[in-house]
UniProtKB/Swiss-Prot annotation:
Protein name according to UniProt: Glycerol-3-phosphate dehydrogenase [NAD(P)+]
Record family assignment: Belongs to the NAD-dependent glycerol-3-phosphate dehydrogenase family.
Pathway entry: Membrane lipid metabolism; glycerophospholipid metabolism
Species of the source: Shewanella pealeana (strain ATCC 700345 / ANG-SQ1)
Enzyme class, spelled out: oxidoreductase
Length: 339
């Protein structure tokens, strides 16, 4: 089947729209699907996504589409950008509509709720093993990417040609630098764990701790991410790159991060429900914390920061008590295999 679009993006939220804007601005005909017809109609009429990225115009090559069948027929390249808790549902709906030559890439960050499975496992359960899969990850705030500010990401996948094609498709000399990576597991894991550590950084700042504490959390958070990654077969070097250190620093230090702002609100005394309401959008790190904590316990991986964030979110522990417990842990060598 001949393509009528170079790529189809599933998910018309802030990040999906930002990636679609970047692709279309780079000369690629891009179809953007959203599950709410009224929202898609607004995109067409306003020529912008006022609900998520107000004031940023949509390029002429970006085509909003409310019909999933039409969107999936338009291109064999499918970029999924939906929250982790609906990822499986969206792909299950897409399965009978996919072309035989479809190739699936996602920018969804996180693990499957309840099970803690990697997104690749959710994808394979939903659509089978016959389609090439890939993931893109890295330090990206949707608003900056949509506005054309320089950004860098990494891509890894199951098929080298698909990865190469995605690099060519997404790379833009003016706005987006794309690195190929061969660590499919590592790129998926980095996007989940960084959300947990970002909540921890927000908690620390909300309590009133300073830059020293925040930096320590980021550094030791990177250790936790690397430790879990190696236990799952990822490469330690991956976490020194865009999907590890890059995403971690961005999410922990800038208030554009919903996860960081969520932690800030909790540190200042809000309860979980109020803090989520204040953000007004999905806080992936809330679910990710339980998933990462459960996964670490199952694998026997020590992740003390993750454990204390979990205790605050799900067991009602005060942020101050969580910080005290981290500080009072047994003294150990920084370079030992266990923290």
């Amino acid at each position: 089947m001949k393509n009528t679009a170079d790529i189809t993006v599933l998910g018309a939220g802030s990040y999906g729209t930002a990636l679609a804007i970047s692709l279309a601005s780079n000369g690629h005909r891009t179809m953007l699907w959203g599950h709410e017809p009224e929202h898609i109609e607004n995109l067409k009429n306003d020529k912008s996504n006022e609900a998520f990225l107000p004031g940023i115009p949509l390029p002429d090559l970006l085509i909003p589409e409310a019909d999933l069948a039409t969107a999936l027929a338009a291109s064999n390249n499918v970029l999924v950008v939906v929250p982790s808790h609906v990822f499986g549902l969206v792909l299950t709906q897409a399965k009978p509509l996919l072309r035989k030559d479809s190739r699936i890439v996602w920018a969804t960050k996180g693990l499957e709720p309840e099970t803690g499975r990697l997104i690749q496992d959710v994808a394979r359960e939903a659509i089978g093993d016959e389609f090439p899969l890939a993931v893109l990850s890295g330090p990206t705030f949707a608003k900056e990417l949509a506005a054309g500010m320089p950004t860098a990401i990494s891509i890894a996948g199951t098929d080298p040609q698909f990865t190469k094609d995605l690099v060519e498709l997404l790379h833009s000399p003016k706005r987006l630098r794309v690195y190929a990576n061969d660590d499919f597991i590592g790129l998926q894991l980095g996007g989940a764990v960084k959300n947990v550590i970002a909540i921890g950084a927000g908690l620390s700042d909300g309590i009133g701790f300073g830059a020293n504490a925040r930096t320590a959390l980021i550094t030791r958070g990177l250790v936790e991410l690397t430790r879990l990654g190696e236990a799952m077969g990822a490469q330690a070097s991956t976490f020194m790159g865009m999907a590890g250190l890059g995403d971690l620093v961005l999410t922990c230090t800038d208030n554009q991060s919903r996860n960081r702002r969520f932690g800030l609100a909790l540190g200042k005394g809000s309860d979980v429900e109020t803090a989520q309401d204040e953000i007004g959008q999905v806080v992936e790190g809330y679910r990710n914390t339980k998933e990462v904590y459960t996964l670490a316990k199952r694998l026997g991986v020590e992740m003390p920061i993750t454990e204390q964030v979990y205790q605050v979110l799900y067991k009602g522990k005060s942020p101050v008590d969580a910080a005290k417990e981290l500080l009072s842990r047994e003294k150990k060598s920084e370079t030992s295999s266990a923290e």
